[in-house]
């Protein structure tokens, strides 16, 4: 059983606020902004409007980035990808999502996401911390602060990054998985994609584990002396982190050895499943972390920023991610873990229906679009096989059941048994929370 509140390691008394639906979250963040109309938001009627000017009437207050604000023409660029229906509910998916199509009955597609941020960094920061202003705690840090850890030998919150094979992605800053003004022990531990996933994972040559233990004991004594003199909570955090690092020297080497998985599992995730730093490897590692009680597992995959050559870009990104994303869902389900895991997929915003740059049948670019885009959820307490929300004929604005960033965050916390208005932290004279003064749980997508 999950250890929460008083029974968890480092959790708050009184949490969870109510019975949780899930024990953990795996958040597959697609950095760069996937194009909703090229993957999920099927608009077949637009094929007849290829090259026509997108009506100004549907962009009454549309902000544009500097990459398209100077364009004289905004021609409609319908998707060049084929769509078909899948699953019992006939969910529309584009051709590159052939693996996800097989798991779609476990997935709730939300077509009506929206945000107010139009550039990558503030938009990603809003999704990860609840604010466009840097410095707030990340969602994983809030969860770690509230619920603590289920495994004393691993962090409660782990972050991993990968990059698309076809395109370099936007920079990702450590503050996206940082603790902000929460105590530092709640920040995410980043597993690196090259070399040892964690620096200093192995002792230097000639240094035994017993010697490391004696050295750490001596250092802890000095730190405890300083803590008693200055009453600085950062010192207690430092002691706890040193101890966790010592335990991770034993737990992490076995964790990251994906080659120990059966061939059938490796084949399911694809050829990159044993290559550190690749998305498939990170998906498999996410399942292994989930098995070992890690509370919040954050993957960032870059390369979705399709300002040009969008059809080939989307296809390449799906080749990198579709098989292993679907494999993660299937793997969790086969092990009986999907029922107590929430899997979240999506980026920081969507893309425009109008073309950025020159438009041809084979090539078009898409600018950033905050007004509507797609996320999906799967796992414990989520209604699988449904599509929630709707957009207009051009996939420009939400027309039914809008879901804001803060609503998504409130819903994720709710599934973990956390009331988003009650998980707070006092800093500089006022109480902060992940959802600020906003957010409502999207109960219609929950079972």
Identify the residue ranges that each predicted region occupies.
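Ligand-binding pockets and gating/stacking loops
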Residues: 1-447
């Amino acid at each position: 059983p999950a250890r929460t509140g008083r029974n968890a390691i480092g959790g708050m008394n009184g949490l969870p606020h109510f019975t949780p639906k899930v024990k953990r979250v795996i958040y597959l963040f697609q950095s760069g902004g996937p194009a909703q109309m090229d993957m999920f938001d099927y608009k077949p009627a637009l094929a007849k409007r290829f090259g026509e000017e997108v009506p100004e009437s549907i962009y009454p207050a549309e902000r544009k980035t500097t990459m398209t604000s100077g364009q004289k023409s905004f021609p409609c660029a319908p998707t060049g990808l084929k769509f078909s229906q899948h699953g019992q509910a006939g969910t529309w998916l584009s051709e590159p999502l052939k693996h996800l199509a097989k798991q779609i009955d476990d997935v709730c597609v939300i077509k009506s996401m929206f945000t107010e941020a139009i550039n990558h960094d503030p938009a990603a920061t809003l999704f990860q911390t609840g604010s466009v202003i840097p410095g707030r705690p990340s969602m994983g840090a809030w969860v770690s602060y509230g619920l603590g850890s289920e495994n004393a030998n691993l962090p409660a919150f782990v972050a991993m990054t990968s990059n698309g094979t076809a395109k370099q992605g936007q920079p990702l800053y450590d503050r996206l998985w940082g603790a902000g003004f929460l105590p530092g022990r709640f920040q995410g531990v980043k597993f690196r994609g090259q070399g040892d996933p964690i620096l200093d994972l192995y002792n230097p040559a000639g240094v035994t584990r017993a010697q490391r233990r004696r050295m750490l004991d001596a250092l802890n004594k000095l730190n405890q002396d300083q803590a008693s003199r200055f009453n600085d909570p950062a010192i207690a955090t430092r002691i706890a982190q040193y101890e966790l690092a010592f335990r991770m020297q034993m737990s992490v080497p076995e964790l990251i050895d994906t080659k120990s998985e059966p061939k059938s599992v490796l084949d399911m995730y694809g050829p990159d499943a044993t290559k550190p730093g690749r998305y498939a490897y990170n998906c498999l590692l996410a399942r292994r972390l989930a098995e070992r009680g890690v509370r919040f597992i954050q993957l960032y995959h870059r390369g979705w920023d399709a300002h040009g050559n969008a059809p080939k870009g989307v296809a390449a990104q799906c080749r990198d991610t579709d098989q292993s994303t679907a494999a993660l869902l299937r793997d969790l389900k086969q092990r009986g873990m999907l029922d107590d895991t929430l899997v979240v997929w999506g980026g920081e915003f969507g893309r425009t229906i109008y073309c950025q740059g020159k438009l041809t049948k084979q090539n078009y670019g898409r600018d950033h679009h905050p007004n509507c885009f797609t996320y999906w959820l799967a796992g414990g307490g989520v209604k699988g096989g449904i599509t929630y929300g709707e957009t207009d004929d051009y996939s420009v604005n939400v027309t039914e059941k809008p879901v804001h960033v803060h609503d998504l965050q409130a819903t994720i916390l709710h599934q973990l048994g956390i009331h988003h208005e009650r998980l707070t932290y006092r800093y500089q004279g006022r109480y902060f929370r992940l959802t600020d003064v906003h957010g409502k749980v999207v109960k219609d997508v929950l079972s």
